Amino acid sequence: MSDTTDLMGARVEETAAAPATDASAPATGAGSRRRRGTGLEGMVLAELQQVASGLGIRGTARMRKSQLIEVIKEAQAAGGAPAKAAPAAADTAGETKPKRRSTSRTRTGDEAPAEKAEKAGKADKKADKAAADKAAAQQQIEIPGQPTPKVNASAEQAAPADDAPSERRRRRATSDAGSPSATDTTVAVETRAEPKADTSAPQQSQGHQQGQGDARSDAEGGDGRRRDRRDRGDRDRGDRGDRGDRGDRGDRGERGRDRRNKGDDQQNQGGGRQDRQQQGGGGRQDRQQHDDGYDDDGSGRRGRRGRYRDRRGRRGRDEIQEPQINEDDVLIPVAGILDILDNYAFIRTSGYLPGPNDVYVSLAQVRKNGLRKGDHLTGAVRQPKEGERREKFNALVRLDSVNGMAPEHGRGRPEFNKLTPLYPQDRLRLETDPGVLTTRIIDLVAPIGKGQRGLIVAPPKTGKTMIMQAIANAITHNNPECHLMVVLVDERPEEVTDMQRSVKGEVISSTFDRPAEDHTTVAELAIERAKRLVELGHDVVVLLDSITRLGRAYNLAAPASGRILSGGVDSTALYPPKRFFGAARNIEDGGSLTILATALVDTGSRMDEVIFEEFKGTGNAELKLDRKLADKRIFPAVDVDASGTRKEEILLGSDELAITWKLRRVLHALDQQQAIELLLDKMKQTKSNAEFLIQIQKTTPTPGNGD
């Protein structure tokens, strides 16, 4: 009876540390499981190793369970005492076997090294008294359903080496056991109620399978691990976890697996897909999506396009964000011409060409304010602060005026292409001083009106630049209400300077040392600027020098179409210059655009001839210069017979028209040189064209009078 009491006392001491160790079993999901079989087959690997050590068998740390059982049986058979294995097994397994019957078998994978060492020492001491305890231990082994004896107060105290791991496992089990099944399993461990523990273990395993399914599929990526979680847990804890004596590798693997399980449980508690909320969690990707607070209508951090991206795009066209201006911002006023490109716009502050001080304008601001290419804008930009990253272009933060008016007034403007064009009706008189014969001759042979589309056909070195300057000065002197724009494309720099100093108007230039793209950019922006002024009802006069060089620039800058005309001219290169020249018109309800362009001829280039042929029939006024007269230093070298204006009867009065026709008859009968010399001589004798025409009327006989 004393031997039995000693054996029960040993089991009570071992059981005192077992509840804290086994408390983590509900959290890990293994559940309590009954011992299968009796005798050596019903023991776990650690118990078999202790039995083998009691029999004096060495080298059992690397043996499998089946091998260890065979070695023990052989040792028992060789020693002739098969019953001796039972007392040793009772001494070693009696410490934990009642506990294992009522709870879980996951103790050995989580045992601390100190606990293992203590057990090994106890097993060696009790090997000597195995014979004395044989009957009692054999009785314990043969009764698998024996309940665990109650633990007294003295046995409840465990070693510090056992308390630390079990305390950590208890806290982990408490924090992870959030489901009702886990709570029931914990209660079952505390009360040692074997039926309740057996029923709660499948529930706990099922809860872990549902909660950890999606998260573990992302972390481990194996479908086989999700098939049978309970079998995998039993195998890990029964076979792999029970090899604690093989070294620290098994302990580290078990602890790492516990940490992964804990992380998976915490991830599942974080949230998951909406359609899997009943499972306790979802995938990592959906959890991050919900944690960030984004839905399908918003734009998440991961750049997801969203289900309603088409509707959001349509709303974005109308919902324009205004630039925010703070109180401490320093605003700098800006002004310039708006140039709208494909995806953005700029205010050209330094002229009509791109510059480093241009101001960026978003397309949202363009659409909101109804801005168009060529508008003159005034506004403000924000001055960069110290330490602030400086952008390449400052953005427009405030729009003050559009073409001198409030921004809201520019939305209802008519479109230039929808305006009704008419023949010129209001005459632009170019006569100024009596000594300036160039403008006086133009008024006589080729009168110009508002909305005229005139072509100055000029061979090289015929004085076309001087004629352009004279026309520009005459327009600014006699018609100050007209907005004058002189566009010089592919010209010499000194001519640009001379034109800027001699003309009181807007000179827009792109010299020949610049690329062809600059020539086309300047011309397009200039004509768009003129159109915007015409839409407002202004009269605009554009002097272009020359349209031939503009056609050359488009031929170089425009992409090749594959259809090459005579002279190497691309078929698509002639349309932009024709669009430029065709913009001249007289508007029915007010406003006009007059364009006088020069065309080069007799240059020896087939390309120039092709370009001139395209424009020869497009104008309604033509002033032709002659190279022979220029070679003889007769200026202005105007070919009187070849020059003229269509529908000149609209611009001239009846009396003036009749006298002009008489003059043309007289000059037509003379040679070209004689005609211009006679005309210049008679005009020098008079102070004005009106006086000259009266003199012509008196001296020239009327046809049909018989004189």
From Swiss-Prot:
Gene that this polypeptide is encoded by: rho
Start and end residues of each stretch annotated as Disordered: 1-38, 76-321
Annotated keywords: ATP-binding, Helicase, Hydrolase, Nucleotide-binding, RNA-binding, Transcription, Transcription regulation, Transcription termination
Quaternary structure note: Homohexamer. The homohexamer assembles into an open ring structure.
Entry's family note: Belongs to the Rho family.
GO biological process, one term: DNA-templated transcription termination
Entries under PROSITE patterns matching the protein: RHO_RNA_BD
Molecular-function GO terms, alphabetical: ATP binding; ATP hydrolysis activity; ATP-dependent activity, acting on RNA; helicase activity; RNA binding
EC supergroup of this enzyme: hydrolase
Protein name as annotated: Transcription termination factor Rho
Binding annotation for ATP: G449, K450, G451, Q452, R453, G454, K461, T462, G463, K464, T465, M466, R492
